[in-house]
């Protein structure tokens, strides 16, 4: 459990450094008002719940039978989000969900298929919104931030599009570079077991792709998942809207959705834990219409900074605590089950 505690503490580091080295204080952060802050938290939790419901929906529809209760499936999705939000590039939660599904006798390939559909839904909706945000930023003269957003979004979208196309036509296996790294750091028997298990799961995933991508039923399921994903992003945008509107009366939901989608894309760079620091900078750069590299003093004195930090606490740190509690509950239930 130590890594989880460390991850939470590290995620707070950018906020702590901001309090130390800038004029921003705790009072400034909560000057947005208690009611808007609570509303921002609720919208952020709604986003998490919609993603959890999407997982439950995909599991029920793709399997065609109940693998567990709705509450348990939603709890697993929420708990796994803690792992997602405490690793670089928002990865790791998928492994938790695959492991949970396989322990409940779901074939590894089908479990990987379900989580891959979740990833694709998030990527497609998130990158499309971010691309719109980048184009609008360019149109408004914010060349630097617009270009950065478009480049990152295009790379992520292109990568996953290639994965989808390849998986639907070929059997993908682990690249030789990765297998060599695994064999270098793990013992022969253990590394072979991991590589064989992973390659089998990937092969099953490719088989599922070929069987399902031409199915109208699958397209309908995935389309509904995309709709849920869009509403999840809309909730994230609304969480910023209720705070941002306290200083900008002309801020609309459309602008807020694009701004938060753009900041999420920047936060997906594998640099910091859960995008901490990058997400805040990305949101600030977008709403400020960044067109050149700013000085540190310009960033620290910007009027948007208080609201952005308030939003980050409401949309990330508080939900993170709830995710941690849910994950601990799942871990304790599993431990008690094993002991009994």
Residue spans of the language-model regions?
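Predominantly cytoplasmic-facing regulatory/coupling regions of multi-pass membrane proteins
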Residues: 1-78, 136, 144-267, 293-340
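Membrane-interface alpha-helices at helix entry/exit sites of multi-pass transporters
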Residues: 70-72, 89, 93, 104-120, ...
């Amino acid at each position: 459990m130590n890594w989880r505690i460390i991850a939470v503490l590290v995620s707070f580091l950018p906020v702590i450094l901001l309090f130390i080295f800038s004029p921003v204080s705790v009072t400034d952060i909560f000057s947005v008002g208690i009611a808007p802050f609570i509303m921002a938290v609720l919208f952020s939790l709604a986003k998490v719940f919609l993603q959890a419901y999407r997982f439950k929906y995909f599991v029920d529809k793709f399997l065609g039978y109940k693998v567990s209760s709705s509450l348990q499936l939603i709890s697993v999705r929420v708990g796994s989000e803690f792992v997602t939000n405490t690793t670089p590039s928002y990865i790791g939660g998928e492994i938790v969900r695959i492991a949970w599904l396989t322990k409940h006798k779901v074939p590894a390939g089908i479990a990987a298929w379900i989580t891959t559909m979740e990833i694709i839904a998030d990527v497609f909706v998130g990158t499309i919104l971010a691309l719109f945000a980048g184009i609008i930023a360019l149109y408004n003269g914010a060349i630097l931030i617009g270009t950065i957003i478009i480049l990152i979004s295009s790379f992520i979208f292109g990568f996953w599009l290639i994965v989808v196309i390849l998986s639907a036509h070929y059997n993908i296996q682990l690249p030789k570079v990765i297998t060599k790294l695994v064999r270098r750091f793990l013992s022969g028997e253990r590394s072979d077991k991991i590589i064989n298990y992973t390659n089998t799961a990937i092969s099953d995933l490719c088989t599922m792709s070929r069987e399902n991508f031409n199915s109208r039923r699958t397209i309908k399921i995935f389309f509904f998942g995309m709709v849920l994903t869009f509403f999840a992003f809309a909730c994230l945008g609304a969480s910023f809207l209720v705070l941002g509107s306290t200083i900008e009366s002309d801020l609309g939901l459309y602008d807020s959705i694009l701004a938060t989608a753009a900041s999420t894309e920047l936060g997906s760079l594998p640099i910091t834990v859960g995008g901490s620091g990058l997400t805040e900078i990305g949101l600030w750069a977008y709403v400020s219409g960044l067109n050149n590299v700013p000085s540190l003093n310009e960033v620290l004195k910007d009027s948007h900074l208080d609201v952005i930090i308030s939003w980050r606490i409401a949309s990330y740190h508080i939900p993170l605590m709830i995710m941690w509690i849910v994950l601990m509950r799942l871990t304790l239930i599993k431990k008690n089950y094993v002991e009994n």
